[in-house]
Amino acid sequence: MDNFELRLNSGKLIDNDSKVHEIGVIAMGSYLENHGSALPIDTDIKIASYVALNVALTTGAKFLGTVCTATEYDYIKHGIHNSLEDILEELEEIIIKYSKIGVNKFLIINCHGGNSDVSKKIEQLQEKIRNNFKEYGTTEKELEYIKKIKYNFKEYGNTEKINIKIKSFGYIHAYSEELSIGKCIGIYDETKFNKHTPENYGEIGMVGLPEARLNNKYIDKEAKMVESIPAVVNEQYGEELIKKMVNESIEYIREFLMLK
């Protein structure tokens, strides 16, 4: 058989649109960042992954995994981070890799505030990939694979169709919202909550990070609130936040499907 036909209409697909198979969802956060005592160091990426996977399950889009790297502003010192260039380089590799299976639209779900500057570089990254897209395949086996992909995904190799969007969600660091989401998705440890205070762990609300508070008035404002209002863990609230994130992300999938 020269070509193999995939049943693109099978299974649960948003609006019963098989073009959703050309959309990939990527989670971006931070793997190495302190979040007090009741949340793990990889809270951000776990939240982003949970949202991204549920968006993929709900719509039929492809879940493409996570971005390993993360960046942060120099004045915020609560973890181990990479440069903005490191993230863009990794994103380029991920996008090029998955474009080989017919994906040409990519939604990045970011749950780490330090990655905010990535959004400023998305259009530039998109143009770079469009201008440098190359089909791999030198052996007969590789060329046969490409032929089968092209048969099922007619836009394969059409660089003008490559489209990247980023949706960011931000909450006060290791405070009520993240704790409530953490409880809902199973990463919060209730037995460690009694020590989860900014007095014990300065990164909570950035209360104990003077350089961050001095350099960013929004961080300082949030820190003052955290100092005066103790964190509250509410699983129902966490569920509401997750539902909101998933639904807002799904709208991006719908926007992708409307593109010609």
UniProtKB/Swiss-Prot annotation:
GO molecular function: 2-amino-5-formylamino-6-(5-phosphoribosylamino)pyrimidin-4(3H)-one formate-lyase activity; ferrous iron binding
Keywords per UniProt: Hydrolase, Iron, Metal-binding, Zinc
Co-factor remark: Requires one Fe(2+) ion for activity. Requires an additional second metal ion that could be Fe(2+) or Zn(2+).
EC number: 3.5.1.102
Keyword Zinc found: yes
Binding positions for Fe cation 2 per the UniProt entry: H35, D44
Catalytic activity: 2-amino-5-formylamino-6-(5-phospho-D-ribosylamino)pyrimidin-4(3H)-one + H2O = 2,5-diamino-6-(1-D-ribosylamino)pyrimidin-4(3H)-one 5'-phosphate + formate + H(+)
Positions that bind Fe cation 1: E33, D44, H112
SUPFAM superfamilies, A to Z: Creatininase (SSF102215)
GO biological process: F420-0 metabolic process; riboflavin biosynthetic process
HAMAP family noted in UniProt: FAPy_deform
Role noted for this protein: Catalyzes the hydrolysis of the formamide of 2-amino-5-formylamino-6-ribosylamino-4(3H)-pyrimidinone 5'-monophosphate (FAPy) to form 2,5-diamino-6-ribosylamino-4(3H)-pyrimidinone 5'-phosphate (APy).
UniProt subunit comment: Homodimer.
Name of the protein this chain belongs to: 2-amino-5-formylamino-6-ribosylaminopyrimidin-4(3H)-one 5'-monophosphate deformylase
Originating gene: arfB
